[in-house]
Structure formats: C-alpha cells, structure tokens
Amino acid sequence: MKIIILGAGAVGRTLASLLSEEHDLVVVDQDTAQLHRLEEESDIRTLTGGASYPNILVNAGIMDADMVVAVTDSDETNIVSCMISKVLNKSVQTVARVREISYLKGKTKEAMDSGEIPVDIHISPEQLITEHIQGLIEIPG
C-alpha cells in the first residue's frame, strides 16, 4: 500500500517506523531536522514542504497513493490536507488527527460524516482518552 504521512512529529515518526516494513511510505514535514532524524532511523522517503500544498502532495505521490494520514500539529492543516488530497485523487483514503473537540460536534461533524468535508476517518486522541476514562468511571472494577 502506498501511504503518505503528513507530519514527522512523534505520531508521524512512530507510524512511519511501524508501517515502513510492509508499505511504500513518504513522510512530509516542514521541519528538515525531524525528517533527517526519521531518515537516519529507517529507510523512508521524506519530502520537505507544507502538508496542504498541492504541489507538495503531487511530489509526494498523491496521484497514486492509497492513503493519506495527516498528523501535523494543526487540525486545520490536517483537515485541509485531506480535502486537497481528495481533490487530487478521489480514491485516496484520508485520515486526519483532529484534537479540537468542537470540530467533531454539530455541523462540522455532520459535514465530515456526510463527506462534505472529505475526511474519511478522523481520530481525536483527546476524545478517545475522555471516552475511555468515562467508561472506567461508569463501569468500575
């Protein structure tokens, strides 16, 4: 599977390390130091640039990518990157980390769920942790 990971922070690096054996990966980030660190750890192609820039996505191979995983530090960049990725490749599966809970409620959640905002899968670490703790409190033992 051809996967583009947008963001070379802790999550992006961990994903890249886990997936690099079985998949064709490209990691995109604006931080060249992070990318060099990743290159030293494993044999992964990297690209310096903005995650939501169409030319960077094209250079990363979006036209024939199977999946884009957007895990930058910016929710807005992650969402826009997924939107631009879908414009460039309608069949690509998009995954975005979304930390701000307000994006996952009301009209914006409806827009994501309906595909109006083309993010196929949105992952909110904060929401997952909150739900897990709430479950522990409600079902003790």
What are these regions (language model features)?
Residues 1-141:
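Cytosolic regulatory regions of ion transport systems
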